[in-house]
Amino acid sequence: MTLLAGFKVVQIGGGSAAAVCGRLMADVGAQVTCIDPDAGTTLLAYLNRGKAVAATATDRHASLAAADLIVREGPPKEWAASPYVLPELRRINASATVVTLSPYGATGPRANDPATDLTLFFASGISRQLLGQVDDLSEAPIRPVGEQSAFIGGLAAACAGMHASLGNQPGASIDVSIHEALSTLAMTELARAGLGHKSWDRKRLGDGNGATVTILPASDGYTAISPREEKQWTSWLKAMDSPAWGNDPRFVPKANRVKNWDALHALMSHWSRLHDKQWIADTAQREHVPSFPLREVSEHLDTPQLRHRGYYRPSDLAGKTIQVPSTPFGLSVAAGRKQDAAKGPLPLSGMRVLDFSWVIAGPTTTRYLAAMGAEVIKVEAPGSGDPGRATELHTVLGQAKKSIVLDLKKPQAVELARALAAKSDILVENYATGVMDRLGLGAEALKAVNPALIYISASGMGRTGPEARAVAYGTLLQCYAGFAGLNRHPDIAPRVGFAWCDPMCGLMLAFVAAAALRHRQHEGGVARVDFSMIEAMLWTMAEPLVATQLGTPPKPVGNASTRHAPHGVWRCAGDDDWISVVVRSDAEWRALCGVVPGLAGMAALDLGQRIEAKDAIDATLTAWAVTRAASTAADSLLSAGIPAAALARYGDLVKSPHLAAREFWDEHGAGVLPGLPWRASFGRATGPAPDLGADSDQVLTNVLGLSQERIAELRTSGALG
């Protein structure tokens, strides 16, 4: 059963991010019709497969008039000359949600700057962090594999558009910035910069986070491990057959492992090179230590886990039948009653979310739900609560939520949780498989107290299949999926890198939650969602998955491109300052030659000739860039119409006139915190993140109707921590 049966989407133009938005909608059952689609690349052909095309003026008008959601992509100047300007779309259909995607948003001084995947990753700051910390700053920053700016932008558009389409916001308009969608993946770093705290440095300091998660060489590749807790470290030593150095005081406790990381990694590597990557991961998992092998994308095309979950479906592409991803979640839908849309100023006004999630992925999901107006009640354990509280993570992801402390080891606390679930619309949890069931808070158990509850579970591998109980973290899953292995320069070993998987999954989950609400409203069905983070990773890695099956398996290429030349990054004057430059056409090449004097004699070169002359072009751009400030160099190229961007630091984004003009930042005490990657005509909810348990009494009184005397009894019993 699909979530969006009867939901009609019109996708206008050839933009990749709009195509991703339409692909996600189609994968969960929407009827997607394209106007002027582009199938010029394998990725676009994949994204637009199976969608209807409105080829005539009559068909286009009819599709637009019937649409629930219209999505289009491009900077404002492109739409000004288009027949699909907003007033015309409103004349045809006054009630549809219209989502406009663009590189830098529809407003602000950078709104019409030319941009590409590479330059957006530079401008967002994500390229500075993607590889993690490096030993040598001469190693160039890179973009990730597979046009990921389109996937992140498309997910943001789908999330915002789905919420706006829930029924209480007819005629909503949404402006999605791909630049902001990328930047907001790094919530912790944005918050640190906004609050004036110490910011992240690309130069490796200490262990470079290795004591938390690292990659070890194996006899046939690499394996990622994450024995971040002392208990896990003890188990990891057992998995390595209790080496003599395991009791060395240099490596106990974790603070000492951080301090002596290079020596420790060398010792572990000596052991790991004797074993194959899957054996290491299996041995670690048997000891409940999070670990996965670094796989090639091709290794995921036929696995017992994905077969069990029916993840792939056949599709014809480029004259060949290949396997393509389906939805990254299992879905069961129980019959129920149709429910009216929320009433209030925001899409989720009046909706209650019971939030059992922690750290990044789940709290990112509920951050979006809170911003869209839901009352989010965050259930935390006594003591320190969500580990995200130890950093700025909770400060930003906890915004506009409520916090209640429940000690779920106490039966009375479990009963309180059940009572709250009985009065909630959505439950979100990302505990290890089996935990909620053992507590009596699983989907089946709560169905008895609230048949209308939408129950969303997120886990590394999904709740079913032979790997369902594997211990996983998002950073390990991006290694397992093949993402980390491809995101590197050809001559450099893979790194874990930036925690990409978790915030990406959180964004996708927020879309799924809104889609499930719409299904409950229109069909009466109540969804049980079993979300798999590895499947979500592979869904966004469609380009390498498809290329592998069409005979061109991807390899690590750094910033190289076969479609554009030049396409790369060059070091500028200053401390670890870089510029990215992309030339997409002969006209842009001639413009570049007009800015960089040393290229003037090459102005007549076409694409093939520029690829052949790569070394000479690189040398000229290297000499030109190294004497200039990155921002100055980028501005000179942008003024000539050439996509370019300086490698942003998060502090640069805090000071950005463009983001200020777009009101991206929210005031927070003496600093600022990042907002959402879209501007909606209906706005969003704001508010500070709660202290641990700050709302316990209020929630128990207002939601459950408990007296102060009863609350005092529960607190004395330990149920409230």
Model-derived features: where do they sit?
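N-terminal glycine-rich dinucleotide-binding loop that anchors FAD/FMN and/or NAD(P) in oxidoreductases
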Residues: 45-56, 393-408, 479
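Alpha-helix N-cap/helix-initiation motif
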Residues: 14, 147-150, 358-359, 409, ...
